[in-house]
Amino acid sequence: PGSSAKKDASGEGSGALHVQSPDWEDQNIYFVMTDRFFDGNTANSDQKKGEYDPSTIAKYSGGDLAGVAQKVDYIKGLGATAVWITPPVANQWWDPMVNYGGYHGYWAENLMKVDKHMGTLAEYQALSRTLHGNGMYLVQDIVPNHMGNFFRIQNIAGKDVFVKNTDSVPVSKPSQSPFNKTDFSNQAQRDAAIYHWTAGISNFDKDEDRWTGQLSDLDDLNTSNPDVVNALKKSYGYWIKAAGVDGFRIDTVKYIEHGFWNDFLWSADPANPGIMTQAKNTGRDNFIAFGECWNAAGAFSDAGDKLTASYLGTEEKPMLNGLLNFSLQSDMVDVFARGKSSDRLAWRLESLVKEYGSLTRLYNFVDNHDMDRFLASANVEDLETALLFMYTIPGVPVIYYGTEQEFQDVRASMFAAGYNSGGKDHFDTESRLYKYLASLAELRKSSKAFTRGEVTVFASTKQGAGILAYRSDSPDGKRMITVSNT
């Protein structure tokens, strides 16, 4: 099916709900913060709980799943073949303890419902069908580490004090069992141990602290409790079956112990099958589960990657089958935006192969929703050079929405009515970077050297900006040479 596959009159999208898995090495991903992308159904924007206000970054702006579906042609024109959306599940809309909202999707209250701001299950299915009808794929962001902030445990004068977030909007505890057992003062709920009853993480370098403490006051799930693991398998497996999701991006991976991942993803237990088993049952034999394991390392250091790579597991006991490439992102900003020596990229590429076995398991990006945009500290030419590098090495390119329209604000809206949009839509298919990214996607498609090649840097600088030249030798004997000036 080509680009003629548009939504039909019923608005249900024209593709199949379930399609076979692609080779992920050949994909280009467009990452959308759904609330800030496009408002396709204005009726769901304001749920009248004081949670909607496009004039502030802290509240909902109105973007939704219908909006993403309506812009599939725009995304496809960039050369993107998959769309990664922020978590669409029912969220805590407003947390009065921190005066901020859950528009971003990472503060769940029910893992098996679509958030009312995002739309309905039917609209989610329509997005899936529309993507599939265009030969594209759907990646859902998931969060097994925590729910929203419905309680706090504060250490006051050496004693743990339990505080309920009673004014949380729209609910003061999750509406889904067993995640609704948030009351530490209730002995039965405390004993159910759905959560780690802990204060905030005090030492991020200490495994036990990181795995069991609350991250930013978010209620930390006890992922070593089989009841929790089975509920997470059921909840997230549901979206593969019900919405035709083709892959997961997994949030906050390093905040969960290693033992969880093999069971959650790969278990063949018929009573509580893992995600991969559930995906296979829908015909997806190459379901992707790539994770965020953000470890700042610094130039010429592989310390961060050693921890990150450990979440791939082993052949006998696999864990995630892809990881976001934070160390390369940091080096790309240093080299292409800050004029540092290009030999740090040469060093990094070699180091990544050593740590991960292959560059193809990595998901590359220049910026994302949790950091300053590349263009906040660099010009368009710098960004173009960084993107050329990213599209001519193995590792799946991920483009954060708005990059193609020269966005500098990390969570600004693409649509006129949304937060910090400047009062206009930003879907210009003639923009310089939109056309440039489309041409890079075509270039990448032209040779397996770019998607599966062995990369050798043969010229780089030891001080300051300058040449970066490398060859990519593909498995089919083709060689591509890329030369750029950083």
Predicted regions and their residues:
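Short, P/G- and charge-enriched loop/turn segments at secondary-structure junctions
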Residues: A16-V19, E350-L352
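Structural recognition of the beta-strand scaffold that forms the well-ordered cores
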Residues: N28-M33, T81-P87, G105-K113, Y137-P144, ...
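Bacterial Sec-dependent N-terminal signal peptides
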Residues: P1-H18
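Substrate-binding/active-site clefts of carbohydrate-active enzymes
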Residues: S21-Q27, D35-A243, D263-A268, P273, ...
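Surface-exposed cleft-lining segments at the edges of enzyme active sites
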Residues: D372-A376
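Beta-strand elements of modular eukaryotic interaction domains
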Residues: V19-Q20, A279
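Active-site-proximal helices and loops of the catalytic beta/alpha 8
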Residues: G11, S128, H146, K234-S358, ...
